[in-house]
């Protein structure tokens, strides 16, 4: 007799959880009870849910489960940054990385959306590793669940252990649209994690059609991985630009802002690489390019990884680039490198997985030819 596959309630959005409970003949309020137990109290079993009837708990035990991803390891940087390697349902060689960055009374969790990445940005370690598959909603929200639970029993009335979530880990979130949206809805729902829409940020390399779709589904904050002031250079650094060039991307960003219920800005992410995109002329070009968009700019000095071929710019060069943009009227921040001693900094996440694209092997072969 074949075992019945249990429904994992961890990844169900509130709407889908209500639908599920109604489908098994239960009242809507039961879904609210269960979602609070899972996401606010960290319950791992139905037996813990003391305000749920014994009969319903027994029923759920038969057909459901609460199963998060498995933590393979946790590393803590000298600056307090934490990195988890998390095993997904794909097996022992399908692991992603999740990073928690503390900063005073803030704690930002960087969440992965894919096992590997389906894009091939030239300066990103994840992209060099290739791609296996998309994460499920349970594997995405499970990263938040794991991070919060790592500090001990969850207390819905205590201080927030995670104040901000950024979809900036491994993978391109908009290439895994539905699971990412479901997970973000859970992050912001009052009965789950209750994060403000301004404190949940999705970062994309520019999957233009999905930006138009995203604003119809949710109103999270949006960040764009731009990294170049023109199409010629961006085509080299961010290959998806060949399909969706900068003008189309900025037009989609403008549409996103115009359709939000409140006034906000887009965050432009720009990784500075020495001798590649960090000269004064390029700073002026970027300032001119972004005049059409309400935005702030986050400069990210490149974080080296083996065989990347790029170098971090000098502090003087970074400050000069920042000043040119600030003088043009932009709010400009320079991201402080955090967690680089445990390979948890921006662009360094690689995980451990089977690469279906053979991209990682191709890069190894290419390096051997050049050496």
From Swiss-Prot:
InterPro entries in the record: Aldolase_TIM, Elp3/MiaA/NifB-like_rSAM, Methyltransferase_A, RlmN_N, RNA_MTrfase_RlmN, rRNA_lsu_MTrfase_RlmN/Cfr, rSAM
Q: Report the record's Gene Ontology biological process terms.
A: rRNA base methylation; tRNA methylation
GO CC list: cytoplasm
Q: Which SUPFAM superfamilies match?
A: Radical SAM enzymes
Tell me which residues make up the Radical SAM core domain.
103-341
Question: Which cofactors are required for activity?
Answer: [4Fe-4S] cluster
Domain of life of the source:
Bacteria
Cystine residue pairs: 110-346
Q: Which CDD domains match?
A: Radical_SAM
Entry binding sites for [4Fe-4S] cluster: 117, 121, 124
Q: Where in the cell is it found?
A: Cytoplasm
> Which Gene3D superfamilies does the record cross-reference, listed alphabetically?
1.10.150.530, Aldolase class I
Enzyme Commission identifier(s): 2.1.1.192
Which is an annotated GO molecular function term of this record? rRNA binding
Catalysed reactions listed for this entry: adenosine(2503) in 23S rRNA + 2 reduced [2Fe-2S]-[ferredoxin] + 2 S-adenosyl-L-methionine = 2-methyladenosine(2503) in 23S rRNA + 5'-deoxyadenosine + L-methionine + 2 oxidized [2Fe-2S]-[ferredoxin] + S-adenosyl-L-homocysteine; adenosine(37) in tRNA + 2 reduced [2Fe-2S]-[ferredoxin] + 2 S-adenosyl-L-methionine = 2-methyladenosine(37) in tRNA + 5'-deoxyadenosine + L-methionine + 2 oxidized [2Fe-2S]-[ferredoxin] + S-adenosyl-L-homocysteine
Q: Where does S-adenosyl-L-methionine bind?
A: 171-172, 203, 225-227, 303
* Annotated keywords: 4Fe-4S, Cytoplasm, Disulfide bond, Iron, Iron-sulfur, Metal-binding, Methyltransferase, rRNA processing, S-adenosyl-L-methionine, Transferase, tRNA processing
Q: What is its main location?
A: cytoplasm
What is noted besides the main data?
A: Reaction proceeds by a ping-pong mechanism involving intermediate methylation of a conserved cysteine residue.
Q: Family, per the entry? A: Belongs to the radical SAM superfamily. RlmN family.
Q: Can you name this protein? A: Dual-specificity RNA methyltransferase RlmN
Q: Which organism is it from?
A: Marinomonas sp. (strain MWYL1)
